Regions:
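Conserved class I S-adenosyl-L-methionine
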Residues: 1-35, 49-53, 66-69, 123-151, 176, ...
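Class I SAM-dependent methyltransferase SAM/SAH-binding core
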Residues: 41-82
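A conserved beta-strand element that flanks and buttresses the S-adenosyl-L-methionine
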Residues: 94
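Short catalytic micro-motifs in class I SAM-dependent methyltransferases
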Residues: 97-101
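A short glycine-rich, Lys/Arg-flanked "PGG" loop and its adjoining helix->strand segment in the class I
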Residues: 106-118
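Short alpha-helix
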Residues: 150-166, 170-172
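C-terminal lobe and adjacent flexible extensions of AdoMet/dcAdoMet transferase-like proteins
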Residues: 190-195, 201-216
């Protein structure tokens, strides 16, 4: 399903946490400790749930339905490939489980580099290629409980794409199905699926940095 239509249908139920979003949160907690986040941008923020309790954080998303569902005043409707922000405005940029929806993410990476302050960081997560190989898909349940598959492009070269845009790789880490994911399975698709998927990587995360002399 086209991402615009998908997020319009997903908006009413987006507040219900999914396993990829949960693992994304675990990765963020593990990888962002000690990094500056005084001026934070969540690019592709959805309903803005992640930044709701972060003072001064800003979000941008292409879906007006998602933004309306969140009801925040520090979010903007817009495309992460052409953002209405000043160059060097943010010391931390998140783009979490978003870039896989783009056929070509290079324009987004270039924008991240532009609006990131020199020495600042970009945190990116995506659906893991191992999950795709195992038959998992990017899906959601609408209000009627119908499951929809969202447009997704498998990609293993995020580090190369970010480098082309002027960012350098700092760290990468995988989020796998483990004990913390058990309840999602038990209350969802079942214990047998949990045992089948145990150890499977579902999310891959990257921390990039804009070099101090980038763009100078």
């Amino acid at each position: 399903m086209d991402v615009h239509q998908a997020y319009r249908l997903w908006a009413p139920t987006y507040h219900k946490e999914t396993l990829p979003h949960y693992l994304d949160g675990e990765l963020a907690h593990a990888m962002l400790q000690g990094l500056p986040q005084t001026h934070l941008l969540d690019a592709g923020c959805g309903a803005g749930t992640r930044i709701r309790d972060i003072p001064g954080a800003v979000g941008i998303d292409l879906s007006p339905e998602m933004l309306a569902a969140g009801g925040l005043h520090t979010v903007f409707a817009g495309d992460i490939r052409e953002m209405p922000f000043a160059s060097g405005q943010f010391d931390m940029i998140w783009c979490r489980l978003v870039l896989g929806h783009l056929r070509d993410p290079i324009p987004a990476y270039r924008e991240f580099c532009r609006v990131c302050t020199p020495g600042g960081y970009v945190f990116v997560t995506d659906f893991h290629p191992d999950a795709t190989l195992a038959g998992h898909r990017r899906t959601f349940n609408d209000e009627a409980g119908v499951v929809h598959e969202v447009e997704h492009y498998e990609r293993i070269n995020h580090a190369d794409l970010a480098l082309q845009a002027g960012l350098e790789l700092v760290a990468t880490r995988d989020g796998a199905v483990g004990p913390s994911a058990r309840d999602f399975y038990i209350h969802g698709i079942g214990r047998r699926a949990y045992l089948r998927d145990f150890g499977l990587n579902l999310v891959r995360a990257y921390v990039f940095r804009r070099p101090e002399d980038a763009g100078s």
